[in-house]
Amino acid sequence: MKRIDIIVSQAIKDDFIEYYTELCTTEKVKCKFTMIDNVMGQGNTNPKMGDAIWPQLNTLFIIFCDDNMPEKISKLMARLNKEYIGEGAAAFVSDVEELG
């Protein structure tokens, strides 16, 4: 099992949800995620701090999935970054084990 943490600018949050839903439909898997809004931080683009200087914020998606999904989500992220240059979208994958 894999955990994928996806951080996107709130400006493209709805597009990520749309693309992820399309992917889940294509792969015939249930579209599951946890979404955390108002995430502050700085990556490869301008800071997203939700203040007067850096007003934008990020959204964090946490997805637990089968081992074959990270490669497909990687392609989804490449699509987002190509369409929205400079907005900020990154994904990180790790191995996880369900407890209980």
Put a short name on every predicted segment.
Residues 1-100:
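Positively charged, small/polar-rich N-terminal and surface patches that mediate targeting and assembly
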